[in-house]
Amino acid sequence: MAFQLALDALAPTTHRDPSLHPILESTVDSIRSSIQTYPWSIPKELLPLLNSYGIPTSGLGTSHHPHAAHKTIETFLLCTHWSFQATTPSSVMFMKPSKFNKLAQVNSNFRELKNYRLHPNDSTRYPFTSPDLPVFPTIFMHDALMYYHPSQIMDLFLRKPNLERLYASLVVPPEAHLSDQSFYPKLYTYTTTRHTLHYVPEGHEAGSYNQPSDAHSWLRINSIRLGNHHLSVTILESWGPVHSLLIQRGTPPPDPSLQAPPTLMTSDLFRSYQEPRLDVVSFRIPDAIELPQATFLQQPLRDRLVPRAVYNALFTYTRAVRTLRTSDPAAFVRMHSSKPDHDWVTSNAWDNLQTFALLNVPLRPNVVYHVLQSPIASLSLYLRQHWRRLTATAVPILSFLTLLQRFLPLPIPLAEVKSITAFRRELYRKKEPHHPLDVFHLQHRVRNYHSAISAVRPASPPHQKLPHALQKAALLLLRPISPLLTATPFFRSEQKSMLPNAELSWTLKRFALPWQASLVLLALSESSILLHKLFSPPTLQAQHDTYHRHLHPGSYSLQWERTPLSIPRTTAFLPFTPTTSTAPPDRSEASLPPAFASTFVPRPPPAASSPGAQPPTTTAAPPTPIEPTQRTHQNSDLALESSTSTEPPPPPIRSPDMTPSAPVLFPEINSPRRFPPQLPATPDLEPAHTPPPLSIPHQDPTDSADPLMGSHLLHHSLPAPPTHPLPSSQLLPAPLTNDPTAIGPVLPFEELHPRRYPENTATFLTRLRSLPSNHLPQPTLNCLLSAVSDQTKVSEEHLWESLQTILPDSQLSNEETNTLGLSTEHLTALAHLYNFQATVYSDRGPILFGPSDTIKRIDITHTTGPPSHFSPGKRLLGSQPSAKGHPSDPLIRAMKSFKVSGNYLPFSEAHNHPTSISHAKNLISNMKNGFDGVLSLLDVSTGQRTGPTPKERIIQIDHYLDTNPGKTTPVVHFAGFAGCGKTYPIQQLLKTKLFKDFRVSCPTTELRTEWKTAMELHGSQSWRFNTWESSILKSSRILVIDEIYKMPRGYLDLSILADPALELVIILGDPLQGEYHSQSKDSSNHRLPSETLRLLPYIDMYCWWSYRIPQCIARLFQIHSFNAWQGVIGSVSTPHDQSPVLTNSHASSLTFNSLGYRSCTISSSQGLTFCDPAIIVLDNYTKWLSSANGLVALTRSRSGVQFMGPSSYVGGTNGSSAMFSDAFNNSLIIMDRYFPSLFPQLKLITSPLTTRGPKLNGATPSASPTHRSPNFHLPPHIPLSYDRDFVTVNPTLPDQGPETRLDTHFLPPSRLPLHFDLPPAITPPPVSTSVDPPQAKASPVYPGEFFDSLAAFFLPAHDPSTREILHKDQSSNQFPWFDRPFSLSCQPSSLISAKHAPNHDPTLLPASINKRLRFRPSDSPHQITADDVVLGLQLFHSLCRAYSRQPNSTVPFNPELFAECISLNEYAQLSSKTQSTIVANASRSDPDWRHTTVKIFAKAQHKVNDGSIFGSWKACQTLALMHDYVILVLGPVKKYQRIFDNADRPPNIYSHCGKTPNQLRDWCQEHLTHSTPKIANDYTAFDQSQHGESVVLEALKMKRLNIPSHLIQLHVHLKTNVSTQFGPLTCMRLTGEPGTYDDNTDYNLAVIYSQYDVGSCPIMVSGDDSLIDHPLPTRHDWPSVLKRLHLRFKLELTSHPLFCGYYVGPAGCIRNPLALFCKLMIAVDDDALDDRRLSYLTEFTTGHLLGESLWHLLPETHVQYQSACFDFFCRRCPRHEKMLLDDSTPALSLLERITSSPRWLTKNAMYLLPAKLRLAITSLSQTQSFPESIEVSHAESELLHYVQ
């Protein structure tokens, strides 16, 4: 802690780094070790979990794996956990040999490996099956325990008496007994079906496997007992689902504490030591609590487990808020349920949690805390709190006292009258009691009792039982009548008195109530207790305990008690009887490497000639293990495994039967289906006498047969095919194979000299050096040696001699080193020898060479040349500019739009293929050494050399790959069934102009010939068709690879890397028809993963049809064929002359060719098409044909197949071909059976692609109605904030960021259902706050012009009434002047132009109807004529030409983007008007209002421009008020189109939609030229002149984007059926319909491109305004278009063009000063200057900030008005507003003053403000809402980039 405080104190100083250096230095070794041991890229969410398990992984690995966390756990188990346990020689079971070799390198005590093939797929994992059991006393069982029953483990111990310990790894989720829900779903998931548990590691479905569902019972037992045999089971460690168990012989000794004598325990302190302890185990799970069960309900435990942190936070939240609504707990839970840490919680658990929290909110603990109280007050409080309990306790006690007299006789002193005398007479005497027969001698016993009492108390006689004090009290009471008592016996007087006298007797007499009364009292007391318990609440203590137990449950722990297991018998451990073996003698680690201790060799079968050879006899074997569907280690391949092996191994064999009765923990053994029948043993397998070492997996071809290979394997192997006929040029042998200085097989350098090399740097092929150095002369081109010598201080001679000790001479002195010099292969060898790592800085960036486990580092710079050169040291290079888009994008778009016979190409997208250097290096190395291909072996020494030889070219490419990293290239994959027509559409595509720069690569010369014939190119273009080798040496923009799967592995990567000019790759092929296999035994190409799996993600769709195969073949494959010929499937004895012959081998093919038949192998016929029936030759190799080759053979011919050869090969027996047998017998060929791992993953399409747009059904989801009370009424005037009508309030709590949706509670009930109210799924990017730095410009020089002087004489003297009109005898009112103030001139300035005020001019709208509206003759819908269709198509083609689009291409519909447009449209509709306005227009959503009806009203405005200044009456602009349904449904469509238009618009076309004046200025400066004149155009009645062609154009635009058809139909229906209050209208443009501006702009642009050949000429369009930079030639078809148009043009050739109120030119743009001058005059006279001044000032600054160049934009007549405006702002604006006239950064105080009152700031003014000011203003609440806010426009322009 003190050290951390010191570091914090040093943080701001320079002493922190030196202080941290020791810490960083200490972590280097651990990080390096972690990266080397665990090199995989682990998901970041799993890294903390692995670290909590104690696994030291750093998370910095880069290798990818489908289940990297499982590999990490497994590596830790083997290399760390098991390695420490293996202290003696041990055996390992169920592990790949390669993995075992690496494990043995970690710990040499791992001596032998035993593998058993218990499943057919185990043959891919285990090369051999061990015939015997392990021999060492310690065994490690790898990931197989879950498939074995304890009885089988007992059998293993009984069969191996020397076996003491069995370490086993078990993979089973410990929570499997709860449910199918995993506690760590990111790490693993599982499901349980019947008796099988299906385990999926890290979501890798392909790596899933099955195991018995009761495998978790291994975690519930602690011992196994069979008679006198005992095995103890110990759980050593658990890492999630992986557990390490130790099973050892015997039982553990008893706990010493249990032997302690009982006499030692004199207290309770150590009492538990005397009791036996439970064997409880627990497992790590997420921190959770268990919710209580609901009352009288049973809920699964898994649905009641919730995170403790969430529960505690929710508990506090529900009691901390002031107001809690019913939806608050659910909303709180919703915030946490989406967190990744809580993915283990079920949805039912979340539901139970929020319900539990809501229903238990009222509960509070009933406790009080009285500290400072007196004892009496505390006693009073105690009695008040506990009086019920005290009473209930006292009543039974009192009831019991009533019976005490009957069971315990206690005498009570009572006075009894014996006699009464008077007048000397005895009037009364008590009779003596009668003494009945004392049966039980009670009197005797009483006397004895009294005698005993008397003996103790002799002073108490039997009949004088009164105490002495009582006797004295009696004498005092009787003293007054003592004379009368003298005669009583008490006083010993016999004389009777005259006076009345009574004789009393005082005795101790027993008294008792009747027993019936006692029982009644007792029953009443017990009843009171019962009633108290039934009707009274629990006690305070019980309430307190229940509250805390109910609302504060403890943490849930996954634990249970382990118990012993007794088994009645054993079950065989193996399915065969193992042989006996003994342990090999122990040898030192230095003398003997780890190897298989008892690897067996299959016994060769007896010779056929031996007369005594008999078939081996078989014996019965014990039952097999419990059914293991798959083993765990086949899914989580360890780190010890090769990194290139990602395919999971096969599972062990499934056991169908079981034998009876077993313990309950493993019920599978009771099932008779679990164990298989008795299997025969394999007596022909015996152990080898001399185990070969594992470190030599390959043999020299000249050596004898591999001892690990049995002769029966050699017997079934294929014979070597005959050699091919040599080509015309001489072939040379591969130098590396025949190098006498090398020995052993050809292997990658990293395998011969294993170390941690950087990826793809040590994969070059070489051989071990066998001879010492031959002292070769040092090469002349030795710059690499010089660079290394300068860095390592080792001489060049020593470096060269060192290379001759590790590399063969053929790799040191050859044509490559003599011509191009040494390469990085030699650098890697030097780095390995001298233990350094080199960083080579090439043109493409730094690349590491040499081992990574060294500390020494050197730097080398490589320049590509020519010639290339290595130099010491590091060269600093500047960064390259980033690309602005891939050059293949136009090609891909063209492919998407290309059609052949009306069908699209069958693909969806181009996939970016990241090239693999390792794949390319592997192939080029094999080509360079002559293992694949023949180019490097061609001898061209006899011919005249005009350039580098093919081998030199290959070497150059190899060098290029060493210093250039990979790149990413688009790849389009066309895949389909044989004959589906993959080639023909591509051939037609390549004939187009855009794809003319291509080349085709084919696997065979036959296929290349077919391409040449089909393309029909000139002879000079024949170089474009190549075989796969020669294609690598050529260059083109587009590469087509036909039959990609017949190319060597890595060919795609090498083709891309070898051609820097390549932009697009098109690959054709069928993954079902097999792949390439090298014919050279030295080729390492087979080490690469299969291309079928690697290219599978690129297959967007698989064409499941055929144009080739006849109907008889199509029926076999259940596929549709367009070939109507029925075809034939039969057999022939001899081939026909014209029929092609397909053979299995090259030798047979050569034989048939020599006999005069056309023949080829089945494999080489792939891609060919035959017209005659194909003849398939059947021979002894037919049964070995793969399913892929069988498919190729059956699908070559258009007319069928005929088999020639013995019919036994198609008879369906074991010696026949299964697919050929099905075909010959007309049986269906099930593709899933022949291609089980590949065919199910193909996305089949059954017909050619006719459209690319998806089909959408439905529009809006139905919403649940809200039911209200029938007597629910609202007041007549409802305020917008009224909320008493809310039935419930459910506020949304978004997961990220604030709520962006606006409130909809105020919407009219009829409009609310029209809103989707969708939350935006895409967060818009933050608006850039950066401000462009101001550029220094010369301030403009203004001629002196006084604003007031110019304004005084600007307005001419005239009578305003002369400019008005009469409409139906009523004068208009567009020039009001009466009582209007004025100060600048003699009349109000508002008379400058007409003012449209519908409220003050009743004639405005009626008088404007005839000019603004066009009516239909009847109510019938508008009919789209043929001319409309033709003109619409012409305009659409012109519009596509403007956007460089293909008219026939379509864009797939993007539902996510459309949903965002819906949200954006609703946001604009709710924010563009105030809530009061929306409520006031509730009738717009009235259901009785037909959505085709439009209400027309006049727009209120005072428009001031050049056309209206000093003009007369002007018709108003009409607005169309449409139904809300139209706006909310079609509005998103227009915004959707706008996004794509903005993305596709060429830079030479400017659209002013959503643009600011500053953007207009920048575009003009970039694109407009100084050429004059420019063409400006405006139309007369543009909206009214659009007829049916506009509807056709708009429909075609929507169809291109694949807008749902019902929306297109709705748009057409509205346009052709619109009606108003004045009558039905034509399909004219209505201002107010969705997309008015966009559609007008597109129509205008289409007309321009129909009239002119635009080319790259800059064009500006905005609605009906347009500007062309210079005159253009007219198109030849313009007259045909013009005659159909209804437009009236207003063309103007001018040197000072006006566009959207701005004068534009190459200098920029400037606001029309005349219009601005008039607006200022009107603002002054209207006394509205304070509200409008800032807006006008910002418009003025656009041109003012241009500097002196602004004068080039204005006509001379407007210079005075520009100067007057400048004078006005200088005089009338305050200082803080004048800062807008300067480019300098404003001061903070001035900024605050400007943003203090922007209430009347207009939209244009907002656009013109600098970004800093605009951001400050928008943060203020009083800013008004614009009809189209800047945020909406920005979102529309940026949305496409975040969706696509």
UniProtKB/Swiss-Prot annotation:
Q: Which InterPro entries match?
A: (+)RNA_virus_helicase_core_dom, Alphavirus-like_MT_dom, DNA/RNA_pol_sf, P-loop_NTPase, Peptidase_C21, RNA-dep_RNA_pol_alsuvir, RNA-dir_pol_PSvirus, Salyut_dom
Enumerate the Pfam families for this protein: Peptidase_C21, RdRP_2, Salyut, Viral_helicase1, Vmethyltransf
Give the record's PTM text: Specific enzymatic cleavages by the host yield mature proteins.
User: What Gene Ontology molecular-function terms does this entry list?
Assistant: ATP binding; cysteine-type endopeptidase activity; mRNA methyltransferase activity; RNA binding; RNA-directed RNA polymerase activity
Q: What is the effect of changing residue 847 to D?
A: Almost complete loss of deubiquitinase activity
Per the database record, which ranges form the (+)RNA virus helicase ATP-binding domain? Answer: 946-1103
In the record, the effect of residue 865 to A is given as: 70% loss of deubiquitinase activity
Hey, where's the site called Cleavage on this chain? 879-880, 1259-1260
Query: What name does UniProt use for this protein?
Result: Non-structural replication polyprotein
> What is the taxonomic lineage of the source species?
Viruses, Riboviria, Orthornavirae, Kitrinoviricota, Alsuviricetes
